[in-house]
Amino acid sequence: KPFGTMAAQSIGAVAEKELDNGTVVVHGVTGLERSLDSLLFGTPGLGGSIQLTNGIRTWAEIEPQRGYDIVTTIDIRIQDILETELRKKCAETKAEWGTAVLMDVETGEIKAISNLRRDNADSTYHEGLNYALMGFEPGSVMKPISMMIALEDKLARFNEKIPTGKSFPYAGGRPISDSHAYNSLTPAEIIEVSSNIGMAKITLRGFEKEPWTFRERLAEIGMFDPMNLGIYGERIPLIPKLGNKNWDRISLSRICYGYSTRIPPIYTLMFYNAFA
C-alpha cells in the first residue's frame, strides 16, 4: 500500500491461499479488495516443465493475465487531512473509536473515509473496523430526517409553535423528556435545540394511528436502499417493523428521534448531504 494505513479498511487487504495443486494465489479478504476481487485477481498462468539432461527447463503454456486496475474517488490529500483531524479529536475526547467520512455535495462521491480505534496499551489510534458501514443507534441526528418527512407530509407548519414542556408521558411508556424545558417550539427550533418531545409530537400527528407507515415513508426516501459503494461489509439500516399495538406507538415515538434503530453513519451522511 503506497499510502500505508490510510483508508485501509475501505481499500481492504489480501491474503495468500494455497490450492490443492500447490499453487499459491492471493485474494482480497476485506474492503474493495474483497468486493472487487473478481476484477482485481486476473487469471493465473499455467506452466509445464520437462527434465532434460542439462537441468530443468520451464515454459509457460498459458500466460497469466493481470487483473483490472480500479480508480477510487478517494482524494489522498483530503484523506490525509481527515484522518489527522479525526485522530486529534479522538485523542482529545478519549474516544474508544471514531469514524469520519467526507462526501462531495454535488456528486455524492466519497472523497475520504477514516476509521480509528484506540490501542489501550499506549492510547494511540490506529485503523480499526469500518465503523462508517456498521449500524449504530444514531440518536438525535435522526431528527432532521424525521422532520423532513413531517414537513413533506404537512404535519406541521414552519411558523407553528408546538407545545413541548420538559416531559411527555405518552401512551403509558416511559415519559419522553428534554434536557431543557421549553413552553413551545417551531419545527426549526425543535431541530436547533434537539427536542425529543417536539419531534415525537409532530411524528405522532401523522403516524400514531398506523405506526408502520412511518417505516414505509423512510423506505420511500431511500433509507433501506443499498448504497453500492463497492466496499465489502456494507449494511443497510435496521429499523423495527411496527404493528398496531400500544407498544408500537411507544416505539414510534422513540424511533423518530433516533432510538431503537441501528443506522450506519454513512447513511446519515447521505441524507445530510441531500439536505446540503
Labelled PLM ranges:
Residues K1-Q9, A13, Y68-D69, D225-M227, ...:
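Conserved SxxK-family serine transpeptidase/carboxypeptidase catalytic domain
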Residues K1-R66, L269:
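Small/polar-residue-rich segments within soluble enzyme cores
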Residues G12-V14, I74, D104:
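Flexible glycine-/small-residue-rich
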Residues S49-E61, A100-S140, I145-A276:
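Beta-lactam-recognizing serine transpeptidase/beta-lactamase-like catalytic domain environment
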Residues G55-G98:
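Conserved, well-ordered alpha-helix/loop/beta-strand core segments that scaffold catalytic motifs
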